[in-house]
A protein has these predicted regions:
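N-terminal small/polar-rich segments of proteins
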Residues: 1-78, 99-151
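Short, surface-exposed beta-strand/strand-loop-strand elements in extracellular ectodomains
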Residues: 76-88
Length: 151
């Protein structure tokens, strides 16, 4: 028997995109705290999700729980933060935050309406394992993870 395999291929383009709207900056209000709070000279990062197909994606956003680069830190860093809806392109999206779920530092939103949603991700890093030790001098970087997940 003579047989032939025939390839069938295709490309799927995501109907959900993630863009940085505002980069985050850590303020240093005291020796042992780094925070994105504007009152402490920080800047809260804002991420924008653009969705052209309703009920097809989740937005997953996680505030940082570790530095991706920093001076050597021999002691513990305690992390807190929050992810919230900042603005939407439609009032029909007003229930997004109330309907969201959390797991650790990650918050997930069902993107049920086509349009644009802006989220912020605040974070506070406290050094010293509860002893409020001074952060060593140097540059610190952490990452907010924001992704579209197909439902």
């Amino acid at each position: 028997i003579l047989a032939e395999n025939i390839d069938v291929s295709g490309t799927v383009q995501s109907r959900c995109t993630v863009n940085v709207d505002t980069p985050g900056i850590y303020g240093n209000p005291n020796a042992y705290t780094l925070t994105t709070a504007p009152a402490s000279a920080g800047q809260v990062p804002i991420v924008r999700f653009d969705v052209t197909l309703a009920n097809a994606y989740f937005a997953q956003i996680s505030y940082p729980t570790a530095f991706t680069s920093s001076p050597s830190l021999p002691d513990t860093v305690a992390w807190t933060g929050a992810v919230t809806v900042v603005q939407t392109s439609s009032s029909d999206m007003s229930g997004y935050h109330a309907a969201s779920t959390t797991s650790g530092s990650m918050r997930q939103y069902a993107l049920t309406i086509a349009g644009t949603t802006w989220f912020d991700a605040t974070s506070i890093a406290t050094y010293g394992g509860g002893q409020n030790k001074a952060f060593p001098g140097g540059a610190y970087k952490a990452v907010v993870l924001a992704q579209c997940i197909a439902q």
